[in-house]
Regions:
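Charged, low-complexity intrinsically disordered terminal segments
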Residues: 57, 73-397
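Single conserved hydrophobic/aromatic residue that forms the stacking wall/gate
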Residues: 1-9, 14, 387-397
Length: 397
């Protein structure tokens, strides 16, 4: 028991998950032999140190990160929006923690309707000349995917490089023959973290929920819509599906391209950084004036960048914090920050859906909502449909 306890205790310094550590310690105390065997099987992050061992960002992009860090330190980086100046410290944190380059020459289109989003996506894919990179957590073999698949096959026949990256668990309703059909048409396909023993996974949190499409390095789509008929409101269970997706034109698309390739390299055991044409840093004309940082987090991340951004925004809010989310299950730090904000006079409002897509998670959400109501927050239920968007807003003054 003492040896096992030391092994688990040492994980506290590595994982920064004290709740999990105490759970294992109690299990080891009451059933030491069984507990130790279970810990060896499911308690360790065997994959974490191996995941995404891709090369660091190279060349011009890596230099851009370093250059921006220096200019921010010396207060030389010009923020095109006066409001953005208030987030200078957060911009710097994202640069250092996530190598998230700030770009300010982007044009962003916002889609909150699935039909409009998929129509825009297909039209942009039809204009592709060099490559199309597609990454989704969920893809269902229905009319929505078939419309996309048709365009991908046509572009592959024209000589456009097409890659499709899917998550094994999220796309479990797809069959091997569906992916083989794409391969026969000249499309590269890779599966993220294939399931073992059917659908059994020792760590279900090692999933890739990203929804990214990059076209020629010039146009990028990112957001909450997966691929399926429910996302265009054709599922009777959910009705109209409320989500948000972005179409970005401008220099920020390069960051999306890099994110896709990091995931692709891990899943396909390749190194696309060697293919220079995928990572040309275009000298963009000014498409717009929207500043963008692409921030990502996951089991491979050394820092919880997205989590820390939320925490910073909540702590610095002076007027209000508004949150829309399908799953309100915050960790202790976020929950405490929201309670403190609410009790300090900040107007905290949380909106959740009226229809669950994951019942257990839904009722867990209500448990935390109860705590927030007790702390003085206002909580709302979106009655029209399932709201899948995860979107916080805050105001300083």
């Amino acid at each position: 028991y003492e040896i096992a306890s030391c092994l688990v205790g040492s994980e506290m310094c590595i994982r920064d998950r004290p709740q999990a550590v105490w759970t294992w310690l109690l299990l080891l105390y009451f059933i030491p032999i069984v507990g130790f065997i279970l810990y060896l099987i499911i308690g360790q992050d065997y994959h974490k140190n191996k995941m995404f061992k891709a090369k660091e960002i190279e060349g011009e992009l890596k230099y851009a990160v370093r250059r921006q860090e220096e200019t921010i330190y010396h207060r030389q980086l010009k923020m095109t929006s006066p409001a953005l100046n208030r987030f200078r410290d957060l911009v710097l944190y994202n640069l250092e923690a996530g190598q998230a380059v700030l770009t300010d020459n982007n044009d962003i289109r916002i889609y909150t309707d699935g039909k409009e989003k998929f129509h825009a996506l297909i039209e942009e894919m039809k204009r592709a000349k060099k490559y199309i990179h597609v990454q989704y957590y969920i893809i269902r073999n229905d009319e929505v995917w078939q419309d996309i698949e048709k365009v991908l096959i046509e572009k592959a026949h024209e000589g456009v490089e097409v890659r499709v990256l899917f998550d094994s668990m999220g796309c479990r309703t797809m069959h091997k023959r569906d992916w083989d059909r794409l391969k026969c048409e000249g499309i590269r396909v890779a599966e993220f973290f294939p399931a073992i023993l059917g659908q059994l996974q020792m760590r279900v949190n090692y999933r890739n929920h990203r929804k990214i499409v990059v076209i020629d390095g010039k146009v990028g789509f990112v957001g909450g819509f997966n691929v399926g008929r429910e996302y265009i409101g054709k599922d009777e269970k959910f009705g109209y599906w409320r989500d948000t997706h972005l179409c970005i034109e401008g220099a920020a698309v390069t960051s999306l391209a890099v994110r896709f390739v990091l995931d692709w390299n891990y899943a396909a055991h390749e190194n696309l950084f060697l293919e220079d044409h995928l990572f040309e840093i275009p000298q963009y004309d000014r498409h717009g004036f929207d500043p963008v940082q692409i921030i990502s987090s996951g089991p491979d991340s050394q820092t919880k960048t997205i989590h820390d951004n939320y925490l910073h925004l909540i702590h610095s809010a002076r007027n209000h914090v508004y949150i829309q989310t399908p799953y309100f299950i915050p960790d202790a730090s976020i929950l405490d920050a929201l309670k403190i904000a609410s009790r300090s006079g900040v107007d905290v409002r949380i909106m959740i859906p009226c229809k669950p897509d994951h019942p257990f998670v839904y009722w867990a959400t209500y448990s935390y909502i109860g705590e927030m109501v007790a702390a003085g927050a206002k909580c709302y239920v979106y009655n029209l449909s399932l709201i899948h968007i995860s979107e916080p807003t805050r105001q300083e003054a």
